[in-house]
């Protein structure tokens, strides 16, 4: 089994990538830019996949993070793509991802204080 530390690093990297992809965009620009939307959606899927790979025990130990909602969002994106509401994706990227990144970073440092790089 892949170490949970690596999934946390994946989530942080994907969150950072979301911020990079939306930099310089406002809501209307994002909604009109299919390339940026696809990139952000991919990173949100990576975040959800990483969250789904964490053990239940790990997720229970960190209840402040809405793990189930993150995984459910990933599942919706993957299985119900044509029902996506792009303004919700924008709000997720701009409002929720930065908070999640801070939460996951704090968990990483608390759980694995000597190891914050993938190697």
Each language-model region and where it sits:
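Solvent-exposed interaction patches of small proteins and small membrane subunits
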Residues: 1-119
């Amino acid at each position: 089994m892949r170490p949970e530390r690596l999934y946390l690093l994946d989530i942080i990297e994907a969150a950072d990538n979301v911020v990079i992809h939306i930099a310089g965009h406002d809501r209307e620009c994002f909604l009109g830019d299919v390339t940026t939307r696809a990139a952000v959606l991919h990173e949100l899927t990576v975040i959800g996949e990483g969250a789904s790979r964490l053990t239940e025990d790990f997720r229970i130990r960190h209840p402040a993070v809405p793990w189930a909602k993150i995984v459910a969002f990933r599942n919706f994106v993957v299985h119900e793509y044509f029902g996506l509401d792009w303004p919700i994706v924008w709000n997720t990227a701009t409002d929720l991802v930065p908070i999640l990144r801070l939460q996951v970073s704090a968990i990483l440092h608390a759980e694995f204080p000597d190891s914050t790089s993938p190697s």
